[in-house]
Amino acid sequence: MSIDSKTSKAMARLIKNVTVHTLWIYVLAILARGATYPYQVKKKIKEMFHFNPPTVTLYTVMYRLEKEGLIRKAENGSYEITEDGKAALKKASDTLRNLSETLDHIWYNLYKL
């Protein structure tokens, strides 16, 4: 997802909302696959989800996730998801799935007219 000069302001806000503002979900999804280091989290987000979050933003998000008990830092500097983190990831996934179904319903009814 990229923003260029032809991207409307509304679309730019949407892209930011589903990438940077929900970065914590991407971090938890990566860590759900196994413990890893922050620089690897950034690399995997770029590879898997096709956006490149600012490094300082990623570290801030990971710091907050750790403070909330959703991830924990190991002695070697890697991070892993906690049970609370897994529950939060599931709830976020369910919430986004419900939103997607609602949007599908809207589109179906819009084009049905």
What are the roles of these predicted feature ranges?
Residues 15-57:
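N-terminal helix-turn-helix DNA-binding core of bacterial DNA-binding proteins
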Residues 44, 61, 106:
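Short acidic/histidine-centered micro-motifs embedded in hydrophobic/aromatic stretches
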Residues 66-74:
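A short, conserved structural fragment
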Residues 77-92:
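Basic, amphipathic "hinge/linker" alpha-helix immediately C-terminal to the N-terminal HTH DNA-binding motif
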Residues 90-113:
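Amphipathic alpha-helical dimerization/coiled-coil segments
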